[in-house]
Amino acid sequence: MNTHRDSTFAQLKWAQEKLGVSHLWQNTVSPMEMTYLPTKQKIIFRGFDDVLKIASTTVPKGYLNFVWIEEAFEISDEADFDKLDLSVPRGKIPEDLFKQTTVTFNPWSENHWLKKRFFDNTDENTATFSTNYLINEFLDETDRKIFEGMKKNNRRKYEVAGLGNWGIAEGLVYENWSVGRPEIPFDEEYKWKC
């Protein structure tokens, strides 16, 4: 849960302050949740360590119909995502509401199941949105300079982390190579013998 405290929980607390509505929320760390005081609706935070524990999550009031999975790229098994998506949110909800699972992530590998599922083979119930550092209103000049430096020094990482393009940002052994005829001059006195 420490990862939530330092990421999603902190982001939503920051948004409450930024929007000037923090007085409408009660935020607790144990259990980690946010309660919207006018309606008593809750935002609950859970880790993805055990998908079966999450699948049994429910709320005492209202409906559990929105799920946000931050850093969804860390879910390596699509079957685990399916278990969660098919069980939370669940149940009948009023007609003026809808069920939604939102996944946020950086597209670190074009071979990840997220690309195939949500970008290559979309259906009418899927909407995808891509953002990048150029349109991120929350970055300051220092942040932008980091991406500009990345653009010059690590183009592949810039394409993924900066521009939000699918790729493989890290881990290849040879980054600067091409296929072609070697440009090695051979003198006539050196003959290859087979």
Predicted ranges, named:
Residues 1-3, 134-135:
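Short histidine/acidic/glycine/proline-rich micro-motifs that form metal-
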Residues 3-65, 166:
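Inter-Walker segment of RecA-like/P-loop motor cores
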Residues 26, 34-38, 118-124, 183-186:
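Short, conserved catalytic or adaptor-binding loops enriched in Gly and charged residues
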Residues 53-56, 115-118, 181-185:
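Catalytic micro-motifs at enzyme active sites that drive phosphoryl/nucleotidyl and oxygen chemistry
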Residues 65-66, 191:
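The start of beta-strands in P-loop NTPase/AAA+ ATPase cores
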Residues 70-72:
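Walker B catalytic acidic pair
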Residues 74-149:
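ASCE P-loop NTPase helicase motor core
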Residues 136-194:
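ATPase catalytic-site recognition across NTP-hydrolyzing enzymes
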